[in-house]
């Protein structure tokens, strides 16, 4: 995490979030997380999402195997964030029997962990996941198939969840192929045994200006 220069006091969550901005996908679907709910950031790195959720009143937990990355999160830890050092690929899951209102995974892929991540969602909890996808080998790293999602793979991972949004495509600046999903674990039936009805998760729509804007011209006549 880079050095943050300020002219006044800075909160721990502000320092973490200012070092690197959160993913727009995470920001967009964070509204599915219950107010004040618990958030687990898997392979949290420098804590860009931990800081962002912490600043908005969520109880946050971050896990990563990099001691260097976690040392940078000391201010967040002092402010109440739970920071865990663990090797998720060569060790036990450190949150056995615990569930979270949201699990965030970005730019990280370890396929054997997917069932555990899904199981860590509390009823009504949301999985917000975004990482590199097949095609990225044509523009940069990662390029190995082990680190790239196959077409539709996240939909298979979320087979038992309610998928609210899914995208698989190309982004610019920097050029990369990504796949991403926002999916909810269904809530249990209420005490009377009657289901609460289908959830109503508002989707974003284009503004009228965007719809009416002329298409850019490509090539010469």
PLM features per residue range, with description:
Residues 37-45:
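Conserved class I S-adenosyl-L-methionine
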Residues 66-68:
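Conserved SAM/SAH-binding beta-strand->alpha-helix loop
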Residues 78-90:
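Conserved SAM-binding strand-loop segment of SAM-dependent methyltransferases
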Residues 125-132:
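Conserved beta-strand signature within the Rossmann-like core of class I S-adenosyl-L-methionine
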Residues 171-221:
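Core SAM-dependent methyltransferase catalytic element
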